Amino acid sequence: MADHMMAMNHGRFPDGTNGLHHHPAHRMGMGQFPSPHHHQQQQPQHAFNALMGEHIHYGAGNMNATSGIRHAMGPGTVNGGHPPSALAPAARFNNSQFMGPPVASQGGSLPASMQLQKLNNQYFNHHPYPHNHYMPDLHPTAGHQMNGTNQHFRDCNPKHSGGSSTPGGAGGSGTPGGSGGTSGGAGGSSAGGSGGGSTMPASVAHVPAAMLPPNVIDTDFIDEEVLMSLVIEMGLDRIKELPELWLGQNEFDFMTDFVCKQQPSRVSC
């Protein structure tokens, strides 16, 4: 094979070498460089071709600096899975069906943001309590397009302040036009600036929802007042021993303890 390659490369290069100590394209008998100076100029352009040189069998073909490797349809040539087109390798890979649209394209991001906004509105409308959440945009380039519809998610407080057991969302209102949001309650109210976000009251000890990561959409802070109102409403504060505490224990131990506790009462009766 080495003799065959030397015969193919003999007399092709003006410096008298046979091409075995140069670019991998020379080893395949595909290079047509006139001088070493021209070879140094073309060296950065053939970085992709040098990587592809390990996977192509020796055969007829041509090397082009602008269009990459264009395989000949003759015998002894392997296409390697790429179509025999004159496009650059980067252009062929960018048009692949496995790659998404570029980030800079605004045409595909707007329908996706509209669909996300529709899902967010359905989620917040079916929420049991009318909290004003913060929902950041998942697409970084579509933030300026949805300012009119997402403004009420940004300008309102993540949690309401109030001394009553009911959430203060009934007294709060947020305007999407950018005039700020107000959240009412028994403890007080806070008014936000014009489109810049609202100031957090001192009574709220929770972390602002704006610091949440963008992929967490179901994270909600626990309001102790609402939780205690539910406990009092269902009467859980009057129960000494909850039956859920027995879950996860052995049934034999549960029955033994239950029978031992019930025997003195039976004897006394």
Swiss-Prot record:
Gly residues biased stretches: 165-198
Pfam families named in the record: CITED
Chief localization: nucleus
Tissue: Ubiquitous.
Keywords, ordered alphabetically: Activator, Developmental protein, Differentiation, Nucleus, Repressor, Transcription, Transcription regulation
Disruption phenotype: Mice embryos die during gestation with left-right patterning defects and severe developmental abnormalities, including cardiac malformations, exencephaly and adrenal agenesis. Show also impaired mesonephric tubules and adrenal cortex development in embryos.
MF (Gene Ontology): chromatin binding; histone acetyltransferase binding; LBD domain binding; RNA polymerase II-specific DNA-binding transcription factor binding; SMAD binding; transcription coactivator activity; transcription coregulator activity; transcription corepressor activity
Parts forming coiled coils: none
Swiss-Prot/TrEMBL GO biological process terms: adrenal cortex formation; adrenal gland development; blood vessel development; bone morphogenesis; cardiac neural crest cell development involved in heart development; cardiac septum morphogenesis; cell population proliferation; cellular response to hypoxia
Domain of life, source organism: Eukaryota
Disordered as annotated region, ranges: 142-200
Gene Ontology CC: one annotated term: chromatin
Localization (cell): Nucleus
Functional description taken from the UniProt entry: Transcriptional coactivator of the p300/CBP-mediated transcription complex. Acts as a bridge, linking TFAP2 transcription factors and the p300/CBP transcriptional coactivator complex in order to stimulate TFAP2-mediated transcriptional activation. Positively regulates TGF-beta signaling through its association with the SMAD/p300/CBP-mediated transcriptional coactivator complex. Stimulates the peroxisome proliferator-activated receptors PPARA transcriptional activity. Enhances estrogen-dependent transactivation mediated by estrogen receptors.
Family designation: Belongs to the CITED family.
Complex and partners: Interacts (via C-terminus) with EP300 (via CH1 domain); the interaction is stimulated in response to hypoxia. Interacts with PPARA. Interacts (via C-terminus) with TFAP2A, TFAP2B and TFAP2C. Interacts (via C-terminus) with SMAD2. Interacts (via C-terminus) with SMAD3 (via MH2 domain). Interacts with LHX2 (via LIM domains). Interacts with WT1 isoform 1 and isoform 3.
Protein name: Cbp/p300-interacting transactivator 2
The gene coding this protein: Cited2
